[in-house]
Amino acid sequence: MVRVSTSEFRVGLRIEIDGQPYLILQNDFVKPGKGQAFNRIKVKNFLTGRVIERTYKSGESVETADIVERSMRLLYTDQEGATFMDDETFEQEVVFWEKLENIRQWLLEDTIYTLVLYNGDVVAVEPPIFMELSIAETAPGVRGDTASGRVLKPAVTNTGAKIMVPIFIDEGELVKVDTRTGSYESRVSK
Protein backbone atom coordinates (compact mmCIF):
# COMPACT_ATOMS: atom_id res chain seq x y z
CA MET A 1 0.00 0.00 0.00
CA VAL A 2 1.10 3.53 -0.73
CA ARG A 3 1.41 6.26 1.87
CA VAL A 4 -0.11 9.65 1.04
CA SER A 5 0.65 12.97 2.71
CA THR A 6 -2.04 15.34 3.97
CA SER A 7 -1.22 17.62 1.02
CA GLU A 8 -2.47 14.83 -1.28
CA PHE A 9 -5.84 14.42 0.49
CA ARG A 10 -8.69 14.80 -2.02
CA VAL A 11 -12.40 14.08 -1.91
CA GLY A 12 -12.85 10.51 -3.17
CA LEU A 13 -9.43 9.29 -1.97
CA ARG A 14 -9.57 5.91 -0.22
CA ILE A 15 -7.44 5.63 2.89
CA GLU A 16 -6.96 3.17 5.72
CA ILE A 17 -7.53 4.25 9.33
CA ASP A 18 -7.00 1.74 12.16
CA GLY A 19 -7.06 -1.16 9.68
CA GLN A 20 -10.42 -0.13 8.16
CA PRO A 21 -11.02 1.28 4.64
CA TYR A 22 -12.44 4.82 4.47
CA LEU A 23 -13.51 7.18 1.69
CA ILE A 24 -12.75 10.89 2.09
CA LEU A 25 -16.03 12.82 1.78
CA GLN A 26 -14.73 16.25 2.78
CA ASN A 27 -11.26 17.75 3.18
CA ASP A 28 -10.67 21.13 4.81
CA PHE A 29 -7.17 22.62 5.02
CA VAL A 30 -6.97 24.93 8.05
CA LYS A 31 -4.09 27.36 8.59
CA PRO A 32 -4.64 29.10 11.90
CA GLY A 33 -2.98 32.45 12.60
CA LYS A 34 -0.93 30.82 15.30
CA GLY A 35 0.25 27.23 15.33
CA GLN A 36 0.67 24.48 12.78
CA ALA A 37 -1.62 23.99 9.77
CA PHE A 38 -3.81 20.89 9.69
CA ASN A 39 -6.34 18.98 7.59
CA ARG A 40 -9.79 18.20 8.98
CA ILE A 41 -11.35 15.36 6.98
CA LYS A 42 -14.75 13.71 7.05
CA VAL A 43 -14.52 10.03 6.07
CA LYS A 44 -17.00 7.20 5.52
CA ASN A 45 -16.20 3.63 6.54
CA PHE A 46 -16.61 1.27 3.56
CA LEU A 47 -17.56 -1.68 5.75
CA THR A 48 -20.01 -0.08 8.20
CA GLY A 49 -21.10 3.09 6.39
CA ARG A 50 -20.35 5.15 9.52
CA VAL A 51 -19.10 8.72 8.96
CA ILE A 52 -16.42 10.15 11.27
CA GLU A 53 -14.18 13.22 11.39
CA ARG A 54 -10.41 13.09 11.81
CA THR A 55 -7.74 15.77 12.09
CA TYR A 56 -4.18 15.36 10.74
CA LYS A 57 -1.26 17.76 11.22
CA SER A 58 0.19 19.12 8.00
CA GLY A 59 2.86 16.73 6.72
CA GLU A 60 1.47 13.57 8.36
CA SER A 61 0.83 10.60 6.10
CA VAL A 62 -1.60 7.68 6.00
CA GLU A 63 -1.82 4.52 3.93
CA THR A 64 -4.15 4.18 0.98
CA ALA A 65 -6.72 1.40 1.25
CA ASP A 66 -6.29 -1.71 -0.91
CA ILE A 67 -9.53 -1.09 -2.81
CA VAL A 68 -10.16 -2.35 -6.33
CA GLU A 69 -13.14 -1.49 -8.52
CA ARG A 70 -14.35 -4.01 -11.09
CA SER A 71 -17.02 -3.50 -13.73
CA MET A 72 -19.28 -6.55 -13.80
CA ARG A 73 -22.59 -7.43 -15.45
CA LEU A 74 -25.57 -8.53 -13.34
CA LEU A 75 -26.57 -11.98 -14.58
CA TYR A 76 -29.44 -12.83 -12.22
CA THR A 77 -30.78 -12.53 -8.69
CA ASP A 78 -32.04 -15.34 -6.44
CA GLN A 79 -32.80 -15.98 -2.75
CA GLU A 80 -29.15 -15.65 -1.72
CA GLY A 81 -28.29 -12.48 -3.60
CA ALA A 82 -27.09 -11.38 -7.02
CA THR A 83 -24.63 -13.03 -9.40
CA PHE A 84 -22.32 -10.75 -11.37
CA MET A 85 -19.95 -11.70 -14.22
CA ASP A 86 -16.82 -10.06 -15.60
CA ASP A 87 -17.34 -9.70 -19.37
CA GLU A 88 -13.64 -10.21 -20.14
CA THR A 89 -12.65 -13.11 -17.87
CA PHE A 90 -16.16 -14.62 -17.41
CA GLU A 91 -15.37 -14.86 -13.69
CA GLN A 92 -18.53 -14.82 -11.56
CA GLU A 93 -19.06 -13.20 -8.15
CA VAL A 94 -22.04 -13.79 -5.86
CA VAL A 95 -22.98 -10.81 -3.67
CA PHE A 96 -25.34 -11.47 -0.76
CA TRP A 97 -28.43 -9.35 -0.10
CA GLU A 98 -26.92 -7.70 3.03
CA LYS A 99 -24.49 -5.81 0.80
CA LEU A 100 -27.19 -4.94 -1.76
CA GLU A 101 -29.91 -3.49 0.49
CA ASN A 102 -29.19 0.15 -0.35
CA ILE A 103 -29.24 -0.43 -4.13
CA ARG A 104 -31.85 -3.17 -4.39
CA GLN A 105 -34.26 -0.88 -6.28
CA TRP A 106 -31.60 -0.32 -8.98
CA LEU A 107 -30.85 -3.99 -9.76
CA LEU A 108 -31.60 -4.76 -13.40
CA GLU A 109 -30.32 -7.85 -15.20
CA ASP A 110 -27.80 -7.38 -18.01
CA THR A 111 -26.62 -4.03 -16.59
CA ILE A 112 -22.99 -3.16 -15.77
CA TYR A 113 -22.31 -2.38 -12.08
CA THR A 114 -19.12 -1.40 -10.25
CA LEU A 115 -18.11 -3.88 -7.55
CA VAL A 116 -15.83 -2.39 -4.88
CA LEU A 117 -13.45 -4.99 -3.42
CA TYR A 118 -11.36 -4.60 -0.26
CA ASN A 119 -8.69 -7.28 0.25
CA GLY A 120 -10.51 -9.44 -2.33
CA ASP A 121 -13.95 -9.25 -0.67
CA VAL A 122 -16.89 -7.29 -2.11
CA VAL A 123 -17.72 -4.41 0.26
CA ALA A 124 -20.05 -2.40 -1.98
CA VAL A 125 -21.86 -2.48 -5.29
CA GLU A 126 -22.37 0.81 -7.12
CA PRO A 127 -25.08 1.10 -9.79
CA PRO A 128 -24.48 3.16 -12.93
CA ILE A 129 -25.12 6.88 -12.33
CA PHE A 130 -27.93 6.94 -14.90
CA MET A 131 -30.24 4.03 -15.73
CA GLU A 132 -32.96 3.64 -18.33
CA LEU A 133 -35.98 2.07 -16.63
CA SER A 134 -39.54 1.47 -17.73
CA ILE A 135 -42.49 2.76 -15.72
CA ALA A 136 -44.40 -0.22 -14.29
CA GLU A 137 -47.18 1.73 -12.62
CA THR A 138 -48.30 5.34 -12.31
CA ALA A 139 -51.55 7.26 -12.18
CA PRO A 140 -52.72 8.55 -15.55
CA GLY A 141 -52.15 12.25 -16.19
CA VAL A 142 -55.45 14.10 -16.00
CA ARG A 143 -56.07 17.22 -18.03
CA GLY A 144 -55.97 20.29 -15.82
CA ASP A 145 -53.53 18.80 -13.28
CA THR A 146 -51.02 21.56 -13.93
CA ALA A 147 -53.51 24.24 -12.88
CA SER A 148 -53.09 23.16 -9.26
CA GLY A 149 -49.30 23.54 -9.59
CA ARG A 150 -48.69 19.78 -9.43
CA VAL A 151 -46.44 18.83 -12.32
CA LEU A 152 -44.99 15.62 -10.82
CA LYS A 153 -46.71 12.38 -9.89
CA PRO A 154 -45.47 9.21 -8.13
CA ALA A 155 -44.42 6.23 -10.23
CA VAL A 156 -42.87 2.78 -9.74
CA THR A 157 -40.22 1.49 -12.16
CA ASN A 158 -39.77 -2.09 -13.39
CA THR A 159 -37.05 -2.54 -10.72
CA GLY A 160 -39.36 -1.39 -7.90
CA ALA A 161 -37.83 2.07 -7.40
CA LYS A 162 -40.33 4.74 -6.39
CA ILE A 163 -39.69 8.01 -8.23
CA MET A 164 -41.53 11.22 -9.13
CA VAL A 165 -42.17 11.74 -12.85
CA PRO A 166 -43.84 14.51 -14.89
CA ILE A 167 -47.58 14.08 -15.47
CA PHE A 168 -47.09 13.37 -19.20
CA ILE A 169 -45.24 10.07 -18.47
CA ASP A 170 -47.44 6.97 -18.85
CA GLU A 171 -47.01 3.30 -17.91
CA GLY A 172 -44.64 1.37 -20.15
CA GLU A 173 -42.53 4.40 -21.11
CA LEU A 174 -38.75 4.41 -20.74
CA VAL A 175 -37.26 7.10 -18.49
CA LYS A 176 -33.70 8.04 -17.55
CA VAL A 177 -33.21 8.06 -13.76
CA ASP A 178 -30.31 9.39 -11.65
CA THR A 179 -29.52 6.57 -9.19
CA ARG A 180 -27.65 8.90 -6.79
CA THR A 181 -30.74 10.98 -6.04
CA GLY A 182 -33.53 8.73 -7.34
CA SER A 183 -34.81 11.54 -9.52
CA TYR A 184 -36.29 11.56 -13.02
CA GLU A 185 -33.92 13.00 -15.64
CA SER A 186 -35.65 12.63 -19.00
CA ARG A 187 -37.87 10.55 -21.23
CA VAL A 188 -36.01 8.04 -23.42
CA SER A 189 -37.08 7.85 -27.05
CA LYS A 190 -37.19 4.37 -28.53
From Swiss-Prot:
Transmembrane segments: none annotated. It is found in: Cytoplasm. Its main location: cytoplasm. Disulfide bonds: none annotated. One of its GO terms (molecular function) is translation elongation factor activity. InterPro entries: Elong-fact-P_C, NA-bd_OB-fold, Rib_uL2_dom2, Transl_elong_fac_P/YeiP, Transl_elong_KOW-like, Transl_elong_P/YeiP_cen, Transl_elong_P/YeiP_CS, Transl_elongation_fac_P. Pfam families: EFP, EFP_N, Elong-fact-P_C. Pathway: Protein biosynthesis; polypeptide chain elongation. One of its GO terms (biological process) is peptide biosynthetic process. It comes from the Bacteria. The keyword Translocase does not apply. Keywords: Cytoplasm, Elongation factor, Protein biosynthesis. One of its GO terms (cellular component) is cytoplasm. Involved in peptide bond synthesis. Stimulates efficient translation and peptide-bond synthesis on native or reconstituted 70S ribosomes in vitro. Probably functions indirectly by altering the affinity of the ribosome for aminoacyl-tRNA, thus increasing their reactivity as acceptors for peptidyl transferase. Belongs to the elongation factor P family. NCBIfam families: efp (TIGR00038), PRK00529.1 (NF001810). This is Elongation factor P 2. It comes from Chlamydia pneumoniae (Chlamydophila pneumoniae). The gene is efp2.
